[in-house]
UniProtKB/Swiss-Prot annotation:
Keywords: NAD, Oxidoreductase, Pyruvate. Substrate binds at R95, R158, H182. It comes from Plasmodium falciparum (isolate CDC / Honduras). The active site is at H182 (proton acceptor). Pfam families: Ldh_1_C (PF02866), Ldh_1_N (PF00056). This is L-lactate dehydrogenase. GO terms for molecular function: L-lactate dehydrogenase activity. Signal peptide: none annotated.
């Protein structure tokens, strides 16, 4: 019998806690919750371990304050980093402020991955994710197919949900693509949206949703994180679920087509930069990078997204 997968969560905050719970519920493997905060990951691990009973699972869940526990990891999920600039109010900071802070963290984590688990599959969540995933790729030395960033899986889940609520259909029946980057420059591809396999344009033609309503949904999708923050909360449940969907496709060799931040090597006319596009995730990691045939307007927006990633990368 093959041993359980070892999944290390580097960062045991809100997202890390939900991910650990989902891993146990799905019986995906043994979990190590790592954090630099003393004792906290151990407490979360103990609490989470009790859910094995209700989940009919048998996953070991442990806490750690040492990078040595990365040793032998099959999957490493990195959420560690600053989510806002220290000493600045919500109105005073932007994502540029995070770059030098989280850059240092990616360099540190990358060195420990290289030392302890160079064959692991890496999922990066730390923002700005399209920049951070490239930094971690460079400093960890893992192959290009073994590292991706969160983005499109989360962004499209929001878009699909909003459209489903307007049309009163099952959210899972909505299919959509958001590419380019995770952030304000994300590219929402209207002509790729389908509902139950039917092009969304048919629903527009039948006056079940208007172009204006769709644009409002697009705007809400782009600004969802801010909307949640303004409601005095933070987004962590849906991000955790999106990440675990990615990890599960790798661990179970499901070969799901998911939109992730991956290394572009000529796709869309860009190279040596991470960007969001559909990929096939299986036991070999990124097994295919799918390049969509964008029209001129879509391509221009994609180029803007990559240009913004390059601008931030230069600041890091």
């Amino acid at each position: 019998m093959a041993p359980k997968a070892k999944i290390v969560l580097v960062g045991s905050g809100m997202i890390g806690g939900v991910m650990a719970t989902l891993i146990v519920q799905k019986n995906l493997g043994d979990v190590v919750l790592f954090d630099i905060v003393k004792n906290m990951p151990h407490g979360k691990a103990l609490d989470t371990s009790h859910t094995n009973v209700m989940a009919y699972s048998n996953c070991k869940v442990s806490g750690s304050n040492t990078y040595d526990d990365l040793a032998g990891a099959d999957v490493v999920i990195v959420t560690a980093g600053f989510t806002k600039a220290p000493g600045k109010s919500d109105k005073e900071w932007n994502r540029d402020d995070l770059l030098p802070l989280n850059n240092k963290i990616m360099i540190e984590i990358g060195g420990h991955i290289k030392k302890n688990c160079p064959n692991a599959f890496i999922i990066v969540v730390t923002n700005p994710v399209d920049v951070m995933v490239q930094l971690l790729h460079q400093h960890s030395g893992v192959p290009k197919n073994k590292i991706i960033g969160l983005g499109g899986v989360l962004d499209t889940s929001r878009l699909k949900y909003y459209i489903s609520q307007k049309l009163n259909v099952c959210p899972r029946d909505v299919n959509a693509h958001i590419v380019g980057a995770h952030g304000n420059k994300m590219v929402l591809l209207k002509r790729y949206i389908t509902v139950g396999g039917i092009p969304l344009q048919e629903f527009i033609n039948n006056k079940l949703i208007s172009d204006a309503e769709l644009e409002a949904i697009f705007d809400r999708t782009v600004n969802t994180a801010l909307e949640i923050v303004n409601l005095h909360a933070s987004p962590y449940v849906a991000p955790a679920a999106a990440i675990i969907e990615m990890a599960e496709s790798y661990l179970k060799d499901l070969k799901k087509v998911l939109i992730c931040s991956t290394l572009l090597e000529g796709q869309y006319g860009h190279s040596d930069i991470f960007g969001g596009t559909p990929v096939v995730l299986g036991a070999n990691g990124v097994e295919q990078v799918i390049e969509l045939q964008l029209n001129s307007e879509e391509k221009a927006k994609f180029d803007e997204a990559i240009a913004e990633t390059k601008r931030m990368k230069a600041l890091a």
